[in-house]
Regions:
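Non-catalytic alpha-helical scaffolds and adjoining flexible linkers that form interface surfaces
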Residues: 1-185
Length: 185
């Protein structure tokens, strides 16, 4: 038995044994350095964990989601607030992609390439459509299609609202507990 204490948000290599759904932890090993996540960063990390617990099926491998999650957690202490928000949205987008709900940010609902000079509206069931009063610029969508970092507050606000709509249909009516923490502080 190890006397090393486990830390929250620390990567572990673990092995289980047993039959059926109830398994026993047979071995664990720390796979990285402990990280200190506090305050608002802790709430963001708990939100990411809750999404994983609520949306990803047990015992299925989602290596790209894990990689995006780990990048997000590892960078929390090094980013400013806008960069953290983008890293979180990037994690959400990767998870949605892995679950089969990804978006092609390079094309509209008519399979036409996004035009950087036009405005678009988002519909969670169809995608992006040209709308002169749309909430997002084509340039923003093209930047997302190229996986470029976005730190503009207006663009981040759009991403947050868009992902909220996309996640709501998967999460159902049961609210996320981690969101309640934002209102307590």
């Amino acid at each position: 038995k190890s006397k090393t204490s486990l830390q929250m948000f620390q990567c572990l290599s673990i092995s289980f044994k047993g039959r059926g759904e109830l398994k026993s932890l047979s071995q664990w090993e720390i796979a990285d350095q402990p990280r200190r996540i506090l305050g608002d960063d802790l709430i963001l990390a708990m939100y990411a964990n809750e999404l994983i617990l609520r949306l990803l099926p047990e015992n299925d491998e989602y290596s790209q989601t894990f990689s995006s999650y780990w990048t997000f957690l590892s960078s929390l202490n090094d980013l400013d607030s806008n960069e953290k928000e983008f890293a979180l949205r990037n994690f959400e987008n990767q998870m949605l992609e892995d679950l089969g709900y990804g978006l092609d940010f390079g094309f509209d609902i008519n399979s036409e390439p996004i035009n950087e000079d036009l405005h678009y509206e988002f519909n969670e069931h169809q995608g992006f459509s040209i709308n002169s009063n749309g909430t997002v610029q084509g340039k923003t969508l093209l930047n997302l299609s190229k996986h470029e970092t976005i730190t503009n507050k207006i663009e981040l606000s759009f991403l947050k609202k868009m992902n909220r709509k996309r996640l709501k249909s998967l999460l159902g009516d049961k609210p996320l507990k981690s969101k309640e923490l934002f209102f307590v502080k």
